């Protein structure tokens, strides 16, 4: 539509005469109703002459040669549009805005009478002199929601055809009649179709009877719908999908329980059902749908060979083959050996026995030839019972685990990387008569002391294996224990023989300074014993001392045996304290006197326990603390000698403990048992064993840690072998000890089911000396 810069001519027309319909309706009834009709808007629009809108004419051309023709057609069109279809002139309503009136003034005059219809804004001027509209705040209770907007026509959902006979079409909220709006003629409809106003639909509002026009927002919605666009701004048609989200956002969860795992993993039951369907489809048991005509055509062709298209069908996945019958034995032969044929007594017993109690279902019989064998009487019965067993007895498939046993073992370091440790026999010490029961290496690593069944204590050179000293302590008793004093300032050997403990200084092997220091250590107690006051009072006999300290006699003193300690029962174990002033003895046959602690500097014997639970087997001092370990047959108790209280009870779970030894660090302990087990205890971890090692076939006699700083320990057994282990202990409490088997040393012979009786480590080198029941000592390096 083009705009003509020239103004069109003003066309005047006579006012129409009043009609009967106008007089019938009345001006008062049309007050506020016809003011918004199309006719009024057209009249008010055409009355304005000197505005720019009057120059806008649809279809007007700008060509000069067609100016006259266009002006005539425009004049005719304007006259047709300005025709009033009503019978009488409509006067200008009060407050109706026209182009001659200011818009704000008209609205104010229209809404003066009703406060509810007043505008919700105030007209002011901004800083630039422009008009500014200031709107009131919206009441969020009513004004923000149009769900309760009052309807203009309150007749409800009633068709307007029932009001065709009446001049009104309904009632407003105040009960006043809403008069029917004036209807234009066909010419008005034609003109309206030519000049279509904005928002025109050509429809009539069923409630008001007025033309139905659309607003800008509604037009925008229709445009978006026709373009397949989202109607509402900010609406996301494809929100992020959450599998467990219902679609409605809640402030609080309906259920805070976590989703089960079955929601996120495939269903096994559905997979089984699907696999059944897949298998049925592959086998042809499930066919796709076909029309009935095709099926009838296929039925016409007959296949007489039933198995022509037969294909081998694989067994079901749950199929388990029937177990095979055992093959027949010699007794089932028609010509069995004579030893399988029953005699008359056995045959009679078989016939008299009940069928369920018979060992066989038949009696063996002998036939000369196969043609003489008759039919088997119970053949059908056996086949029937076999069928019943296959039908009724459940079957099970037992899967064999093909697992390499080596893969189950822990990964241990290579023993070659853990050297040095003893591997071969370097020397053999011969000369002992009978079994060698005990062995000990001196703190300097030069001499080896041993004791055996012959009652001799012998001292050998470690490197050469030559015997350099010996002394016979008893003709009847065996030497059960030998132990060097751990201090290097003096050289003293403690040997247990029967009920006596002898303290020996082999002065022929010592230098004068060491000999003098050793004699002073042993002689210091004699003066203390002499000056000690008597414990008897009121004429009562003194109590018997637990140990009697005396000199052994001239014969033994000349040999270097200087002190003899006599206790109440036979001593089997002797262990020194780290300071060298105390040593403990264990007499398993004694009860309250089984464990005794002896003080060398005072020649004093003490019994630390009034009564002991169980039979004592061995005892050991802690290497750095005032803790004393006592092992009975089944338990190991640790006592604090300073506080005189029980610290801990270890439970190895063994039937009979043979020996124990404490790690130089003091936090670990190994236990040897007569039931062939070697146990490692971590004192900081638990009272139960940390590791249990079963490598021996016979009882374990002795266990020993290396005291020179090497991570080695060993045990001896009656099977004639010595097991060497790597035992690494670190200071980090979060890391456990590392135990690795290194070497099995074999060389001792077993005599009377006794093998290796004792063991001791070199104080510095990775060497060890073992004592065997075969009467020899062996140095392993």
Curated annotation (Swiss-Prot):
Residues 1-103, 529-553 are annotated as: Disordered. Residues 60-73 have a biased composition (Acidic residues). One of its GO terms (biological process) is maturation of 5.8S rRNA from tricistronic rRNA transcript (SSU-rRNA, 5.8S rRNA, LSU-rRNA). GO terms for cellular component: nucleoplasm; PeBoW complex; preribosome, large subunit precursor. WD repeats lie at residues 431-470, 474-515, 611-651, 652-691, 695-735, 751-781. The keyword Ribonucleoprotein does not apply. Residues 1-11 have a biased composition (Basic residues). It is found in: Nucleus, Nucleolus; Nucleus, Nucleoplasm. SMART domains: BOP1NT, WD40. Keywords: Nucleus, Repeat, Ribosome biogenesis, rRNA processing, WD repeat. Its main location: nucleus. InterPro entries: BOP1/Erb1 (IPR028598), BOP1_N_dom (IPR012953), WD40/YVTN_repeat-like_dom_sf (IPR015943), WD40_repeat_CS (IPR019775), WD40_repeat_dom_sf (IPR036322), WD40_rpt (IPR001680). Residues 36-46 have a biased composition (Basic and acidic residues). Belongs to the WD repeat BOP1/ERB1 family. Component of the NOP7 complex, which is required for maturation of the 25S and 5.8S ribosomal RNAs and formation of the 60S ribosome. Component of the NOP7 complex, composed of erb1, nop7 and ytm1. The complex is held together by erb1, which interacts with nop7 via its N-terminal domain and with ytm1 via a high-affinity interaction between the seven-bladed beta-propeller domains of the 2 proteins. The NOP7 complex associates with the 66S pre-ribosome. This is Ribosome biogenesis protein erb1.
